[in-house]
């Protein structure tokens, strides 16, 4: 990539491109996720000025968020990335954009616990009532953030249940006291679902959706549907 001074030099010394097969002029928006950020308009103006020195050459500027700002940012090619996975790009209305990633795990054990018992490493969660606690076979080694302990929720059948205690390396615990017992076997648990999507889990983990996806390790099996 070139900074502004280098681009100016190149414009004045086009002979430096002799022998190169240049196919596209490309740049990348730094703040496309924020629709009213003035940087977007400034970058577009600078990009158009650069394009004017290379007439006829195709151009590409917009990532997922940039492609939703306005057609002015589209040019000959857009470069959607996270939108292909249904990731919501910042504060931009997404219309028909829908999440395509679901993350499931299984219940390994269900046990009863007494009011006052503590759950997980460090005993950070103390039960306020007699409870049913399920141990789920996923942990931070699978990419499930430790920040989600005591914050996140999972879906079991048609009912949600809170994650309680610390997230461990290979497991975590969920309070299933209010979940219909019929849903606990075979015990499929949805960690990402329509009611708790990437934007929600990222918010609870105090990170961004991109990090949630890229931290999914090799242990979770991938199943590609309707591909």
Predicted regions mapped to residue ranges:
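Active-site loop/helix belt of alpha/beta enzymes
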Residues: 1-106, 110-115
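C-terminal accessory subdomain/extension
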Residues: 112-227
